[in-house]
Structure formats: structure tokens, C-alpha cells
Design a protein with these regions (language model features):
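Ligand-binding clefts of soluble mixed alpha/beta catalytic domains
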Residues: 1-192
Length: 192
């Protein structure tokens, strides 16, 4: 992602903020066409660029900083979504993600979003996705934007599926139930 930033900004120079904190997201100030710009970019080389509690906080603070000083925002997306699991849920991933969501939604500066490779689920949404109505949103021709990650079935789930008994189709169920009813002996009325 740093190579992309280097090619976009004037003289290939930028000022990174909080480089040692929440490494799955990059927040930096740079110049593009001589004008100051704030860049929020996912870092796919760190945990695939997934958003967690710290990265959501880092991005929210940076967006608020840029908005306070009237610095336009550029979002570079290569994000698989938010971290999931009991540990992050107990640490408040919803609360931290909401901070980022609120910061991006209330920012009044111009916003541009570029989807470079992948943008899935809530990660796409909070990184200034279409719902925020950015001033410009573009995607690389091979980029994937989706609610869920598209995955091939794993071999273990395929093997499990082959061992399970096949569930009959609705048409098969109704015919088998009808034949079961006709072969069941009936008792005279009033008896068990």
C-alpha cells in the first residue's frame, strides 16, 4: 500500500501518523497537486488489512483531525472487513467501529474513495463506501466489492456433506408421506 501512496503523492513524500500503532491501517498527510490531503488506507500486509478496535480508533481520530482543519480525505481500500471473534467482541469492536463510522459520516471535507483490490462488508462501508456519498468513488477494474467474502467450499465441508444422509426434495417428501399414509393400518373409530 505504501507503494501506491508513493506513486499518488507529490514527490513521493508523505507524513505518517501513528506508524507503530494499529498497523492494519495507514493514516498519513501528503500533498497531491500541491494541496494537503489526508490518506486513510488499509494495509493488507498486516493481518490482510482487517479492521480491529485499534485501527478503527486510529482512523476515527485521523478523520476528525482532517475534518477540523479542512483537509480533504482520500480512502484507499483493500479491506476484508472487521475482525470477528469473542475476544474482540468483548473488547468492544462494535463501539470502536461505530466511532469510525460516526467520524466518516460527519466529516464535511471532500472525500474520495478508491477500491484497489477488495472491499467486503462493514469494512467497505466505514472506509467511506458508497453509502457515505463520497465526492468520487472509483474501483480498480479487478476489484471486488461485496457484502461477504466469496470462498470456495473447503475439502472438509465437502467430505462432511458426502457423509450426511441426503434430505429428500419437497416433491419426494410429499409422495413418500402419501405412500406411508396409505400403508398404515387404520383403527376403527373410537379405538387407539
Amino acid at each position: 500500500m505504501y507503494e501506491v501512496i508513493r506513486r499518488l503523492v507529490d514527490d513521493g513524500e508523505w507524513f505518517d501518523l501513528k506508524t507503530q500503532f494499529a498497523k492494519t491501517i495507514i493514516t498519513c498527510l501528503a500533498r497531491m497537486g500541491g494541496r494537503a490531503v489526508g490518506i486513510v488506507a488499509s494495509q493488507p500486509r498486516q493481518l490482510g488489512g482487517i479492521l480491529d478496535n485499534d485501527s478503527a480508533d486510529k482512523a476515527a481520530r485521523f478523520v476528525n483531525l482532517c475534518d477540523a482543519f479542512g483537509i480533504p480525505l482520500l480512502f484507499l481500500q483493500d479491506v476484508p472487513g472487521f475482525m470477528v471473534g469473542t475476544k474482540v467482541e468483548q473488547a468492544g469492536i462494535i463501539r470502536h467501529g461505530a466511532k469510525m463510522l460516526y467520524a466518516v459520516s460527519r466529516a464535511t471535507v471532500p472525500k474520495v474513495t478508491v477500491v484497489l483490490r477488495k472491499a467486503y462488508g462493514a469494512g467497505y462501508y466505514v472506509m467511506c463506501g458508497k453509502a457515505y456519498e463520497p465526492d468520487l468513488i472509483v474501483a480498480w477494474p479487478s476489484a471486488e466489492i461485496s457484502v461477504m467474502v466469496r470462498r470456495a467450499p473447503s475439502t472438509s465441508s465437502s467430505a462432511d456433506r458426502s457423509r450426511r444422509p441426503r434430505t429428500p426434495r419437497p416433491s419426494e417428501r410429499s409422495s413418500s408421506m402419501a405412500s406411508a399414509r396409505s400403508s398404515t393400518p387404520t383403527s376403527p373409530p373410537g379405538t387407539l
